[in-house]
Amino acid sequence: MRIFVYGSLRTKQGNSHWMTNALLLGEYSIDNYQLYSLGHYPGAVPGNGTVHGEVYRIDNATLAELDALRTRGGEYARQLIQTPYGSAWMYVYQRPVEGLTLIESGNWLDRDQY
């Protein structure tokens, strides 16, 4: 299975160690989403924009670990999207974004510019 990551799980980011058993397939940008800073990590929500990230091939054990990290407390929900590498899971932020900083470029690597 595949997963699209756009923040701290990306290469050389704070939580990239969770992806050590994953195979990077390539970069991908998804339209109709906006990226917000939650502090040390981002949240993507449906909206007018594009979010940039990476697609990985992962195993069931890695997905279970990521679900435990991302979906506890209802902060994110996993959603199936289509990528050039095939369908992939994406974690979509589930809480209100009012008061959060919009990352206008849609790229978490640009977060220090906002």
Curated annotation (Swiss-Prot):
CDD domains: GGCT_like
Keyword hit for Cytoplasm: yes
Broad class of where this protein is predominantly found: cytoplasm
Gene3D superfamilies for this protein: Gamma-glutamyl cyclotransferase-like
Compartments (UniProt record): Cytoplasm
Keyword line: Cytoplasm
InterPro entries reported in the protein's UniProt record: AIG2-like_dom, GGACT, GGCT-like, GGCT-like_sf
Gene Ontology CC terms, in alphabetical order: cytosol
Molecular function as annotated in GO: gamma-glutamylaminecyclotransferase activity
Similarity comment text for this entry: Belongs to the gamma-glutamylcyclotransferase family.
Biological function: May play a role in antibiotic biosynthesis.
Protein name in the entry: Gamma-glutamylcyclotransferase family protein ytfP
Species of origin: Citrobacter rodentium (strain ICC168) (Citrobacter freundii biotype 4280)
